[in-house]
């Protein structure tokens, strides 16, 4: 019987966000903050898990994965430092350019599900399917000033260097990350003898998330706070990859959807990444969820909004 999927080993991702701060307070990745919100520990940031899929996707899609790859994931269960997780990828038909991916803990708990594929004509991803089912939402409190279609009023210049501290949101350097990355690769390294086929080091897929988020959001993306946020869904799509270390890029952001559940309010932010020739090289979709319980006075404000609408 032919094998239906391939997988990596059980690996233990390392937490680098213990000291993360935003809006003047610590994040969910701090043990004390996580405990105060009822979580069993400070979770590993979701994008950390993306690196474990790279060897599998390189095996399936070859070097084209680094040029036009797309990884699209729905985070289902948190992972805590010390836990081991394994990445899986379904083996697609020979003609297919997209496949299913997932990650599990040692006890079988599913950490994430999603899809991965290559371009240039990207097929419908798992998040495309998820977004098509979103219902219209109203009575938002934390995101009352965030609307679908809202475009950022700023364009940011961003880059990642080996020893560049990425700020309060990501209090570490690329060199720090490479010392603990779950799946090392010589193409990420600074040493000349380890240079990639492109002649210079490439940015790991998980660090593209850092590249597009370390500067924060445009000033007109106004989220009420203090409030605690976390990644719920994420997609990174390359059109002209890979992205390179020490290369400057321009990014623009746009809200393409808002939604909510019983516990969170969320926005879906698309970041467009342009190279120095103003060519679109990547898109990064982040569904950021904000915990209602972490915003003081949430219920009172909700009643006020609901009451004014009912009148």
Regions found by a protein language model. Give the residues of each.
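HotDog/MaoC-like acyl-thioester-processing domains
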Residues: 1-18, 80-81, 86-151, 240-311
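Hot-dog-fold acyl-thioester-processing enzymes
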Residues: 1-67, 121-233, 295-311
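Hydrophobic beta-strand-centered segment that forms part of the acyl-chain substrate-binding groove
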Residues: 48-98, 206-255, 282-285, 289
